[in-house]
Regions:
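Mobile, glycine/GP-rich and aromatic-enriched active-site lid/loop segments adjacent to catalytic centers
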Residues: 119-209, 278-462, 547-662
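N-terminal Rossmann-like FAD-binding beta1-loop-alpha1 element of flavoenzymes
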Residues: 23-51
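Long, amphipathic alpha-helical stalk/connector segments used for oligomerization, subunit docking
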Residues: 486-580
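Extreme N-terminal leader/targeting segments of oxidoreductases
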Residues: 1-23
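Glycine-rich FAD pyrophosphate-binding loop
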Residues: 43-65
Length: 662
């Protein structure tokens, strides 16, 4: 096949827009909005320009786009940041960056208080101890959390909210900050929506320093080149890299947002940023097919889950699991709960069901009819606030969860760093808590000078959720302002010419223009592959060789090495992707990002010779947890010029004692 050259002979050349700023925010989710809010407080009065570039529309972008029914990280007066570290460490199987987690724990409550100040309805306890939903609490002028109001806890760390418009509220604060910066600095535009950043740009004279980013509009034929002094890369985690349980027309239904395409991990790796714990993944066990949340049902409504024989699989499978996983079975992290469920599913003891009907009937025994009606209403709102599709699945199948139990199912794997997972980038810590080797500069700065990350981007420190991600964004906003002030006399220069970047990025459209008429069916063509087809190949490869749902999350050294062969073939073919339109160009570049993020994941699993996260993945040739050799971080760097990975260990340090007040 002839090499691809783009001289825009067969497609329209895009308009090239160059935008200079000081602080560049890539992403528009919870982390980026928090960063915009805080950066405005510190940077605007210094005359520093802030620019946000969002792949979507900021009001409904990011993982919180559909809404949430709970804030999963609120420390409160009854807990301490040290308690929070113990909780996260326990759930992530003993290996976390405790400095980063502690840093979130001591700051996150202030962020939640801001959410309430901005209008987020938060459930409260009244003087008699009754639970009052957020809307009623607002109408009744109940005191705020900041003033000492008591939230309704669905778990030790979770508080209930009426959160359908959660992201809209947080986005409004971020956009107001951008508007203030725009007015004070006199720039015409500093908020770009529907612009997909696909590559970071390093400084020509110092490749270890960030200089900007480049992307394209998904609505207009425009290439955007952003030059900056410092950048936040907060473009979410990675979904649709593995074959999905949902198929056909339902393939878009996943637990994590399908537009998260691994951009954070891939773009950072390409400019030399160090990755950490990319072997980690999250496999949420949720309501089958709808992926609705189970947390409120388990924690607030006290529902129980059993196998088809009515057995509590978490109890019946404990003893056998201790042989491989010892103390980790008793500490019962999220992955271990998955593992105990999977044992029964593989043994034919499914379906696994959560008894929502029994839970509501038990609660109703001590309630009035009015209270029961309100409880059922809140149970439904739990889904309408954050996973409308779950309500749709129940309705389509003539199921009433208050009358019948519902199936649970572990999903396909996702890569993330903000929920019950810890994949991401290796970043500098706060400096006042932790060893010197964890603090080499500004808080949450990567190993690339001037490049920061937050939320799903910060590795080895999961369980931030929405509030913690926004908190990390706020931390970064202040740090980015400090970085700009400290480096005010420095300038950056691109190594790449914008014209050449346009040729590279729009190559798939040139390929389509040149070859689409070669065959009668544009989907079957020897000169190109369409992005949808390439994605299916990637998902099949990852599923079969890297431990997806098709193998019950099982892989091994030999399976991975076989997968690497096919991955190399896939990467070779990826350069022949075509794009009929801007949307397909978006899909093509999402694939480039997914391929690199997926490869990082596979190579980290190959390097770590143990099963650190049973229930998320299994190394069939190393089924046990091996604390003696592998209680450490697995980190890596990628050389984009050679395609080679350097994977290595970094020491784990325990900073918070095991003692727990509970």
């Amino acid at each position: 096949m002839e090499p691809k050259v783009n001289n825009f002979e067969f497609s329209e050349k895009p308009e090239i827009v160059v935008h200079e700023t000081d602080i560049l925010l890539i992403g528009g989710g919870m982390a980026a909005c928090g960063c915009a809010y805080e950066a405005d407080r510190w940077a605007t009065e210094q005359g520093l320009r802030i620019t946000m570039v969002d792949k979507a529309a900021t009001d409904r972008s990011g993982a919180v786009a559909m809404g949430l029914s709970a804030i999963n990280t609120y420390v409160g007066q009854e807990n301490t940041p040290e308690d929070y570290v113990r909780y996260v460490r326990n759930d992530l199987m003993g290996i976390i960056r405790e400095d980063l987690v502690y840093d979130v724990g001591r700051l996150v409550d202030d962020t939640v208080h801001l959410f309430e100040d901005w209008g987020l309805p938060i459930w409260k306890k009244d003087e008699e101890g009754h639970s009052i939903d957020g809307h009623t609490a607002l109408r009744n002028d109940m005191i705020s959390l900041r003033e000492g109001g008591k939230p309704v806890r669905s778990g030790r760390w979770q508080i209930m909210i009426n959160g359908e418009s959660y992201k809209v509220i947080v986005a409004e604060a971020g956009k107001a900050a951008l508007a203030n910066n725009r007015e004070k600095t006199g720039v015409e535009q500093n908020h770009f929506e529907r612009v997909f950043i696909v590559k970071l740009l390093s400084d020509k004279n110092d490749p270890t320093k960030i200089a900007g980013a480049v992307g394209f509009s998904v609505r207009e034929k425009k290439l955007y080149v952003f030059k900056c002094k410092t950048a936040l890369l907060a473009a979410g985690g990675c979904v649709n890299v593995f074959k999905t349980r949902a198929t056909g027309e339902g393939q878009g239904r996943a637990w994590f947002p399908v537009w998260n395409s691994g951009s954070t991990y891939a773009m950072a790796a390409e400019v030399g940023a160090e990755l950490t714990m990319m072997e980690n993944r999250f496999v949420p066990a949720r309501f089958k097919d709808g992926y609705g949340p189970v947390g409120a049902w388990f924690l607030l409504f006290k529902a129980k889950a059993t196998n088809a024989f009515g057995e509590d699989y978490q109890e019946t499978n404990k003893e056998e699991s201790r042989k491989l996983y010892g103390k980790y079975v008793d500490s019962m992290g999220t992955c271990m709960r998955n593992h105990l469920m999977i044992i029964d599913m593989k043994a034919g003891k499914g379906p696994i069901k959560i008894h929502t009907d029994v839970a509501l009937q038990k609660l109703a025994e001590t309630m009035t009819k009015k209270e029961i009606k309100h409880l059922e209403s809140e149970a439904w709102e739990d889904f309408l606030d954050m996973t409308i599709t779950q309500a749709g699945v129940w309705a389509a199948n003539n199921m009433e969860p208050e009358k019948v139990p519902s199936e649970l199912m572990p999903s396909e794997p996702y890569l993330l760093g903000s929920h019950a997972g810890c994949a991401g980038l290796w970043t500098s810590g706060p400096g006042d808590f932790g060893p010197e080797e964890w603090h080499w500069g500004y808080n949450r700065m990567t190993t690339v000078n001037g490049l920061f990350t937050a939320g799903d981007g910060v590795g080895a420190s999961g369980h931030k959720f929405s509030s913690g991600s926004n908190t990390e964004g706020r931390i970064v906003g202040k740090m980015m302002a400090a970085y700009c002030i400290d480096h005010k006399d420095e300038s950056v220069e691109f190594a790449e010419d914008p014209e050449d970047l346009a040729k590279e990025i729009f190559m798939p459209m040139e390929t389509w223009g040149k070859y689409s008429d070669y065959t009668t069916d544009p989907n079957i063509n020897p000169h190109y592959i369409r992005p949808g087809m390439l994605q299916q190949r990637l998902q099949k490869l990852m599923d079969e060789y890297v431990g997806g749902v098709g193998t019950w999350y099982m892989t091994s050294k030999y399976m991975l090495e076989e997968g690497f062969y096919y991955l190399d073939m896939l990467k070779e073919d990826s350069y022949h992707m075509c794009a009929e339109n801007l949307h397909e160009l978006l899909r093509a570049w999402e694939n480039f990002h997914r391929i690199l993020a997926g490869e990082a994941h596979a190579r980290h699993i190959h390097f770590r010779e143990e099963t650190r996260y049973p229930g998320y993945y299994y190394r069939g040739d190393h089924l046990a947890i091996d604390d003696e050799n592998w209680k450490c971080f697995v980190n890596s760097t990628y050389d984009k010029n050679t395609g080679e990975w350097n994977i290595f260990k970094r020491d784990y340090h325990q900073l918070v004692s095991d003692a727990d007040k509970s």
